[in-house]
Amino acid sequence: MNYLEFEVIWGVNNIYSILELKSKLIYEGIFKGKILETGCKEYSPLVPGDIVLGYVYGSRKVYIDKRVSRKNILWRYNRKVDLRQAIVSNVDNVLIVNSANFPEMKNFFIDRVLVVAEEQNIVPVIVINKIDKGISQRVEEFSEIYKNLGYRVLKTSVKTFEGIKEVKEILRNSRTSFIGQSGVGKSSLINLIDSRASQSVNEISEKYSRGKHTTVYSISFHSENWIIVDTPGIKEFGVETLPFENLKYYFKEFENFASFCKYKSCLHVSEPHCSVTNSLGNGISKPRYESYLKILSELKNYKNYAK
């Protein structure tokens, strides 16, 4: 049996569609045993972007033997099984898709993704979608906050095609994950960029009796120019792999003030003579600071599975 290297495209019920890296042929992969030993507790051992090694048997069938170490990972918390659940791995960019009006932008969600992206060396881009329906004042205000911090913010519409060219430029020659909550138009945006993605989603939905245009698991799409990963609508995004004392380094706006704090170990919470807390509303955004406090509290009470 040939022992080859593959990339995971998608999977359900421990049956995976995997791409052989040299021939670019699609194989069906399964675990030879009941589980794949990965050395950590998690709900889904394989996600799009994972590189695996396996033995070919039969006609395009593979026994998956090993998962290669991941360069990076994005994950969420699965409450049903009380475990972390990987979403995608080994990505270059993450596009954080939001609606310009409804559903309401969740700045706390954006801040969580930004922290993880920075910590995992993934380039984050904030996308404001559905701008043809108007942009709320709240969204405009947060867009300016993120722009002033140096984050790229794109405004897009699948109806007017605004911003689509810029999105394609980001995708070119890279692997990019689209992250966002349900209803923000994430999958519609992907389908406009690559029509083959829509066809693939429909075929998979029909095969597994899922609703069309509803992403219930991560799926990657390969083209000559890019690799796109569509992900399920996410309510809770995992951050708990980060040591709590390091969180402050991933809030860019703190950098210009932290050196003036009395204590080098200052966490910018209730310490005396803290330059960060003294600058709230004057260089430090209050909503961003509230996100910092929420995430910090979570990290101090992390789950063991996240380490």
Curated annotation (Swiss-Prot):
Its cofactor is Zn(2+). GTP binds at residues 129-132, 180-188. Keywords: Cytoplasm, GTP-binding, Hydrolase, Metal-binding, Nucleotide-binding, Ribosome biogenesis, RNA-binding, rRNA-binding, Zinc. PROSITE patterns: ENGC_GTPASE (PS50936), G_CP (PS51721). Binds 1 zinc ion per subunit. Monomer. Associates with 30S ribosomal subunit, binds 16S rRNA. NCBIfam families: ribosome small subunit-dependent GTPase A. This is Small ribosomal subunit biogenesis GTPase RsgA. The gene is rsgA.
